[in-house]
Swiss-Prot record:
Domain ABC transporter stretches: 397-631
Compartment(s) of residence: Cell membrane
Name the UniProt record assigns to this protein: Putative ABC transporter ATP-binding protein MG015 homolog
UniProt keyword terms in alphabetical order: ATP-binding, Cell membrane, Membrane, Nucleotide-binding, Transmembrane, Transmembrane helix, Transport
InterPro entries named in the record: AAA+_ATPase (IPR003593), ABC1_TM_dom (IPR011527), ABC1_TM_sf (IPR036640), ABC_transporter-like_ATP-bd (IPR003439), ABC_transporter-like_CS (IPR017871), P-loop_NTPase (IPR027417), Type_1_exporter (IPR039421)
Family stated for the protein in its record: Belongs to the ABC transporter superfamily.
Domain ABC transmembrane type-1: 54-364
Organism the protein comes from: Mycoplasma pneumoniae (strain ATCC 29342 / M129 / Subtype 1)
Domain of life, per lineage: Bacteria
Amino acid sequence: MLSSCRAVTSMSRWSKHKKTKEVISMLSHNQKPNSWKILWRLIKSVQGRTSSKVLYVMVCAIFGILTGVTNSILLAQGLGFIFPTTNTETDGIQSVYLLVFAHNLPVMERLTIVCVTVVVAYILIFSFNVAQNYLGLKLYQEICALLRWKAYLKIQSMSTSFFDTQNNGDLMSRLTNDVYNINNLYAQVGGQTIQSLFILMTTATILFVLSPVIALISLTVLIALIALSFLFLKKARAAYAKVQNNLGDMSGYIEEVLSNHKVVHVLKLQEVMIDNFDKYNRPMVNPTIKANTYAVFIYSWFGFISNITYLASISIATAFSVNNIPSFGVSAINYSFMLSYIAALRQTALPLNQIFSLWNLIQLGIVSGERVFKILDLESPQKQATITKLPNIKGNIRFEKVVFGYSADKPILTGIDFSVKHGDIVAIVGPTGAGKSTIINLLMKFYKPFAGKIYMDNFEISEVSETAWREKISIVLQDPFLFSGTIKENIRMGRQDATDEEIIEACKVANAHDFIMRLPQGYNTFISNKTDYLSVGERQLLTIARAVIRNAPVLLLDEATSSIDVHSEKLIQQSIGRLMKDKTSFIISHRLSIIRNATLIIVINDGKVLEMGNHEQLMRQNGFYARLKRSAVK
């Protein structure tokens, strides 16, 4: 929980060059990613789902495609069936019509037969497309929910030091915006890709059946022109990557400012924050324009090469017909052949054209996939602990020559030694920056010391899992934090199996029961960290009740009574007094009344223990503690 001072410091870092942040970030782009590998991982994510669901989508897509292609050919050849030429020989699919239906039927009856056949095909196409879209969307939503859950799980498994170097807004953007882009890739492009593969195989087969020579020439021209498109794809992807990275930076800035809006208003920083926002907003413009320009160009380019391919095919077929060159296929080169061939060729180019029209979604999906996979590929802290469950702990705490710093080149604690017995009330005293909160952070196992050892009873901290270690510790921070939910649910966060009766008793111990009962819905009143009808003191009493229900043998109080009014302070001190009973308590506070009652005061400065003793002993020594207290009184 950040204090106001830390909030201002945190916001000020946005004014630094963002390159500094990229260097320290574990999610920064240190190497050029491979788009095909990312795309393959996205495909494997689909493959990893229930095979039957994937099969249903593919079956619907295949039948829809086959019906559509067949319908196009039936429609083209049906014209020849309706209006037969004087040639007694019939080619291609016209023969099918004549075999099924009498060739001597009147024109209107022939028209009816063709129309009914085509309408039935359209109904089948519609049915298969609806089924494919529904099943596909359901499948893709499940995949994205799984990706989002895995990414969130990975983030939750990371150590506290990970969050010291990460942009929270960027993490949120990866879990929301990037997963949304992946969903669009699956929903818009996934089904289209399945269709495209089978359309290409089906129509290519039809083209080669009609005329293998002309088909080979047409497809060669088409493939050669498509190959030129890949010259622009790398540039387009780089532009989209820049857009997403800038969006993550901007999201981080917005999250930081909005979460500290009170500090911004108190310090009248609105204009400064607006100017800083523009530094993140404006860089979004040019990369976005550039990325979309590439997408439009690629789409238009493919439309151009499709038309060139059609023209080339017609020219070649005409040349074959004029020079009496056989088609080497099942049909002679005539009017019906041209209709069938161009229809099949259009069906070949159409899915590719549709994919190129969605190229912006493809690039965004690949870039977003890379950003999400960077989270999934993070190495979780190594679980070296061999003890996953601690027995009943008394709460004896011992530091042995502990050395630690938030950066390797700047140690904050240098050889901390002290020993605390069960039931002691320990006050940690020192000037700002001496390392008081760092000791609390190490006790909570948020960080690993560079050197030295920390013991709880006879268990060394590195041998115990984080969960088992923290089960034995309760903490009350300077800034009370409330979860979104009812008061009862908030208190139960301290211990999930607590009964309603235990929650009420804990609130009575914490002096919170009376004001809770004055609320309209009592313990079922909905609150959140932004609730404004609870005072700071009342919010702190709720966090104390949460610590009471936890009933851990070690208690940490980090400035728990600062910024509290006199009436609330008395209630909080009473509740803390009850809470500390039969516990080993560590207190960080500037209030003399709280420090005076400590059984042991540890005085630290510049990362070292200078003095230890109770208040009277340290005052008689007339050392650093005595000078610190006299200066505080002045």
